[in-house]
Amino acid sequence: MSSFVIEGGHELRGEIIPQGAKNEALQVICATLLSSEKITINNIPNILDVNNLIDLLQDMGVKICKLGDNSYSFEAKEINLDYFQSQDFHSKSSFLRGSVMLVGPLVGRFGRAVVAKPGGDKIGRRRLDTHFIGIQKLGANFIYDAQNRAYQIEGKNLRGCYMLLDEASVTGTANIIMAAVLATGTTTIYNAACEPYIQQLCKMLNSMGAKIKGIASNLLTIEGVSELHGCVHQILPDMIEIGSFIGMAAITNSEITIKNVSYENLGMIPDSFRKLGIQLFVKDDDIIIPKQTSYTIESYMDGSIMTIADAPWPGLSPDLLSVMLVVATKAQGSVLIHQKMFESRLFFVDKLIDMGAQIILCDPHRATIIGLGERFKLRSAVMSSPDIRAGIALLIAAMGAEGTSIIHNIDQIDRGYENIDERINRLGGKITRQE
């Protein structure tokens, strides 16, 4: 099991370019199954989850060519549908939560699919109902194979329909869109997720010949077409990594510039950090975080404690709350972090408490952080990364701590962050990877 050894207290300086967006990459790579023609995707992040999905598509028969460090072409002309019944497919797909998004394009184009119960972060209940109910409404049948812990899906003649999603699930919306673009007739999806990565998926599909209207809204109308063609697609920068870099700069009292952030697609992220007292400025399409010796959490106008909570787009992504929680430990003032979507994502705070942070875990969804200001330094610690987002939060905490910390199980961090140790070290950090 690999580990990071982090020497805390090093100031960062310089420029950094964010990786391509993990969540968009998983969606658009799955979408390449919808066409037999060549599709080129640029700015694909070199991370475990994405690389595992690429390997899985290759095993399915997709011809994949690496064109550059972060560019690939995909040609899904001949797919081995029998491979879905193999133990190899079940094993690989069960360890990758993004594999659930194979269902939409496979049923849409081939009329059948198999998906093992997918893995991913252990951050509480993450139901698949939205995916399955939406695709069922298009005419697919789902049968659960208890022996193999897999779903067998049949849907030879999908037909468009109206559907109201009971939650604005991002991956659920993506899956339904990919199933609907080749269905007969018109599909209307109300309460659809509308975050930038869904917008990107829709734009890519339209460039392939799909007919999707209402992009960037929660009401999508999809007129089915008979076939889709090739295209060239550029993945957006990863908003979660951008937020992570802001957190690193804040907790290490550093000045850094984050380049080419696609600022208009960051939503509430910059303002949420400003609520914690973090200064940041926008120049062209770059974010500049100046060196701050201290920062103070804002209060509401009536003087009550600030609450920062996740919400569907354009609200704050739940993936950044762990980072914001760590940043708040060094602030002046108090804040309530409310993680609405997942009930186990705050359980890593016990590790921060061991490092000296003042945190009250109110319940599985809420934590109050009492910032102790610049005079306070976290203590170094030995810990293990429980998931991607808690892992990067613990890494940020270790960078701001006194002494040398060790984080085990860093495969969790590698699942979502590209060569993060090397990139931080180029800014002045001191992180050693131990295999």
State where each predicted segment sits.
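Short, structured segments at the rim of ligand-binding sites
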Residues: M1-E435
